[in-house]
Structures are given as structure tokens and as C-alpha cells.
Amino acid sequence: MKELEEKIKEYGTVLPGNVLKVDAFLNHQVDPQLMLHIGQKFAKLFANEGITKIWTVESSGIAPAVMTGLEMNLPVIFARKHKSLTLNQNMYTADVYSYTKKTTNRISISKKYVDADDKILMIDDFLANGQAVEGLLEIADQAGVQVAGAGIVIEKSFQPGAGELKERGIRVESLARIQSLSDNKVEFVKD
């Protein structure tokens, strides 16, 4: 997605450890117009899949997931990272390791919002090693729901996440695919 790649070039910052900081438009400050276009693109890519719900992990996946839900007229469920006093024990849970924060979080989705006949689309801001998507897949397995695929805003193609998901038969659609973050420069995969 050209518009997204331009935003990354203009506002993205490469940090040590192959971390791409995009807090100017995605992870802290959110560009609503860009998120709308991202939602429209995912809606088009997954239009004929019979999707019933969109899942993401809080918090940076919420904006693109909500815009995708808006475009597809579908509810969005975000997996919570922290236990809430308002959420009871009727939860599906999975442990997810965060590459950027170097911590493990237990994510959870209330069973109340999951139906046995659901077909879900997973949306996430980044795909590097695939931990967040793997956590959502684990919850999908527990719930017995079908998975249509994963819509990824930014994929680090030089890390194994996308390849491993595709090997498992998961459809992965990434809007910006990064080949390298060497020398503090973002280099995109050339299609």
C-alpha cells in the first residue's frame, strides 16, 4: 500500500534491535484517514471470505481493526492484555511474548462474544515473529472458530512470522512488507 509506505518513510524511525517506531501515525498518535484507507484495503482483500468478526490484540491493533470492522460492517473484539475486574472467568486465554517490550502477556477474549460458527479475521499492527497472531490462533482453536486469515499493517519480512503462518495454511495479507531495517533505513520488499 503506497500511502502506508510513504508514511513509514516520512515518519518511521529505525531503532536498535530491528525495531521500527511508527508512533507518529499508528502506535501512539493515530492518523484516522490512513486507518480508514487501511480498513478499506483489508475489507476489499477479505470481502468474499464469509467473515463474522474481527479480532485483534490491544492496543495498537485496535485502530486498523475498528476501521476494517466499519468497512465490513462487523463487530471487532480485542484481546485484553491485562486482567480486568469487569471480566469474569469465562475467558479464552493465551500467552503472548512481545518482541518490542520483551515481556509475556496473557491475552484474553470473553466467551460471551464468541460464537461456535464464527469465522474470524485477525488484524494486527506488526508481524515480526508472529506471537500476537499465534496467541489469537490459540484462542481460535480453544473456541473452535474458523480463521479466514490475518491482515497485517506492517510485516517485517526478514523475520519468520509470516512464513511460519503461511506454512500452517494461514492466509496473510500485509499492506507494507519490510525487507530490511539495516543502516537505519527502511527497505521494502519489491513485489
Curated annotation (Swiss-Prot):
EC number annotated for this UniProt entry: 2.4.2.22
GO cellular component: cytoplasm
SUPFAM superfamilies listed in its UniProt record: PRTase-like (SSF53271)
GO biological process, alphabetically ordered: purine ribonucleoside salvage; xanthine metabolic process; XMP salvage
Reaction(s) the record says it catalyses: XMP + diphosphate = xanthine + 5-phospho-alpha-D-ribose 1-diphosphate
Protein's pathway: Purine metabolism; XMP biosynthesis via salvage pathway; XMP from xanthine: step 1/1
InterPro entries according to UniProt: PRibTrfase_dom, PRTase-like, Pur/Pyrimidine_PRTase, Xanthine_PRibTrfase
Disulfide bond sites: none
CDD domains: PRTases_typeI (cd06223)
Single GO MF descriptor: xanthine phosphoribosyltransferase activity
Binding of xanthine, residues: 20, 27, 156
Similarity comment: Belongs to the purine/pyrimidine phosphoribosyltransferase family. Xpt subfamily.
Function as written in the Swiss-Prot or TrEMBL entry: Converts the preformed base xanthine, a product of nucleic acid breakdown, to xanthosine 5'-monophosphate (XMP), so it can be reused for RNA or DNA synthesis.
Designated name of the protein: Xanthine phosphoribosyltransferase
Species of provenance: Limosilactobacillus reuteri (strain DSM 20016)
Recorded name of the encoding gene: xpt
